[in-house]
């Protein structure tokens, strides 16, 4: 059994944070699964959107760390949606059901792409206050699979899993990263054929982000510079798309830094969210913010943040 799955932190998380299931569509089979932790008085929480192979609990490190600092954190698992518009409409209904007018979104890989599409979808009546995009992309054509996107629903689960496992690191990795990969493989095994097929369809369906619709959104781009499924060209395209974005660079972390470099990822999320302290868009309980921190935040520069190897 994987080290993460039997770790004290993961078991503490599973025993203290309940998994909720919410239906917002007419189709009762479309169920959002989510963990909602931290002070309910916070009305602009940070919401985590997982990658193709991930479930809501892959962000358990961030939930534990950020709620300990006073933040409200929600981690989601998607229902089966087959196109981006359907996803955006369902996500909007979910926010309405949770009585959340605006939110901060952290998206990993596919989650980051969907976060951008939702910000674009709601640009006339904005629901997204800020974005943190981790190992993410802005154009699905980078995967060269737009021509197969409409056939994933026909493929058996074992074939879909084989496609996804091909993106996991196969070379030598450090023990912490190996544990993260084992955990993600376990999470992948928990997804059924429809869930896998719909996520791969969303990941590869021909689509791109229209940046002019979300140019006023605060963005942090978080990239890892070792073994990642994303090419350097895809990362450079993100930098061009968001020239004013803050950049959080991790030298190592692979495809799943939120698991194997969780302390650094949580720190950069905290740095990103500090710009909203003292406003109605704060994701933190005001009682947890000191006057000194607010003063420091007023002079906090837009910058690139580098992480040293652990």
From Swiss-Prot:
Name of the encoding gene: spg21
Keyword annotations of the record: Cytoplasm
Lineage: Eukaryota, Metazoa, Chordata, Craniata, Vertebrata
Protein family (similarity comment): Belongs to the AB hydrolase superfamily.
Main location: cytoplasm
Protein name: Maspardin
Gene3D superfamilies per UniProt: alpha/beta hydrolase (3.40.50.1820)
GO cellular component: cytosol; trans-Golgi network transport vesicle
Pfam families with a match to the protein in the record: Abhydrolase_1 (PF00561)
Localization: Cytoplasm
């Amino acid at each position: 059994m994987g080290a993460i799955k039997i770790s004290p932190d993961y078991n503490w998380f599973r025993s203290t944070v309940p998994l909720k299931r919410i239906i917002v569509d007419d189709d009762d089979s479309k169920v959002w699964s989510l963990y909602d932790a931290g002070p309910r008085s916070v009305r602009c929480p940070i919401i985590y959107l997982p990658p193709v192979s991930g479930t809501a609990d892959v962000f358990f490190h961030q939930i534990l760390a950020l709620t300990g600092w006073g933040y409200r954190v929600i981690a989601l698992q998607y229902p089966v949606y087959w196109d981006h518009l359907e996803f955006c409409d369902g996500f909007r209904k979910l926010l309405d059901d949770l009585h959340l007018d605006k939110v901060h979104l952290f998206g990993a890989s596919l989650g980051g792409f969907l976060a951008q599409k939702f910000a674009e979808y709601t640009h006339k009546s904005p629901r997204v206050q800020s974005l943190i995009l981790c190992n993410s992309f802005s154009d699905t054509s980078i995967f060269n699979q737009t021509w197969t996107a409409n056939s994933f629903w026909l493929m058996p689960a074992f074939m879909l899993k084989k496609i996804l496992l091909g993106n996991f690191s196969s070379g030598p990795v450090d023990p912490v990263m190996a544990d993260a990969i084992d955990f993600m493989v376990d999470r992948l095994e928990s997804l059924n054929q429809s869930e896998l097929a719909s996520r791969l369809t969303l990941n590869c369906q021909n689509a791109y982000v229209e940046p002019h619709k979300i140019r006023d959104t605060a963005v942090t781009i978080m990239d890892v510079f070792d073994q990642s499924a994303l090419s350097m060209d895809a990362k450079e395209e993100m930098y061009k798309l968001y020239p004013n974005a803050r950049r959080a660079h991790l030298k190592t972390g692979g495809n799943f830094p939120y698991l194997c470099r969780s302390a650094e990822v949580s720190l950069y999320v905290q740095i990103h969210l500090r710009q909203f302290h003292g406003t109605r868009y704060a994701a933190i309980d005001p009682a947890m913010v000191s006057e000194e921190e607010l003063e420091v935040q007023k002079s906090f520069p837009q910058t690139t943040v580098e992480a040293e190897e652990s």
